[in-house]
Amino acid sequence: MRFIALLISFFALLKVISAISGVDISSASTIESFTCLKSAGYDFAIIRAYESLGQVDPNGPHSVYNARDAGIEYVDVYMFPCPTCGNGAGQAETMVNYLKGYNANYGMVWLDIEGPQYWMSQSENVAFFESLVAGLKAEGAHIGVYTSASQWEPIMGGYTGGSEFPLWYAHYDGNPSFSDFSPFNGWSTPSVKQYDDTGDSCGLGFDLNWYP
């Protein structure tokens, strides 16, 4: 019995050790900032590459470079689309091609779905989301979705089409675990959690994220 208890404790510890912490940013950065974050134990970064005004983020490619040059192993980007600007596929393709123009080396593209007040009717929102997805798929992007039940449901209603993609969800409880997660709209298990939005060190403001 004692052996079983020790074994359970070992696997629990192994899971904690294998989990990694990361940041997401929406501002300009430097290599020095990411080197500092790397030294502080952050191993992944998610960089804003498209702004909600309907334009690419000019800081995006350079922040991808900076994170890579600082030794951050996992670097993704996120897209904050402009629903009322229309042409989701065009927005997605513009962002991807802008990053390609800089030879920015990143993994996932996370679609940031939040702020119901900035969206349209639920049927229009679903169509716009599917257009974004089509544009990213046409460019060969690996897609994920950043949202939470409180944001997704007012925007998309009962639509479950987003659940074919990994979920990065936000809940600012300061707890780097999925113990708080409740399934919604087809997502039964999340991939990443944004658990704190008050990160401020190494010359950067950032959100804190956790990946098991």
Swiss-Prot record:
Its main location: secreted. Gene3D superfamilies: Glycosidases (3.20.20.80). InterPro entries: GH25_Enzymes, Glyco_hydro_25, Glycoside_hydrolase_SF. Keywords: Antimicrobial, Bacteriolytic enzyme, Glycosidase, Hydrolase, Secreted, Signal. The active site is at D24, D112, E114. It is found in: Secreted. This is Probable GH family 25 lysozyme 2.
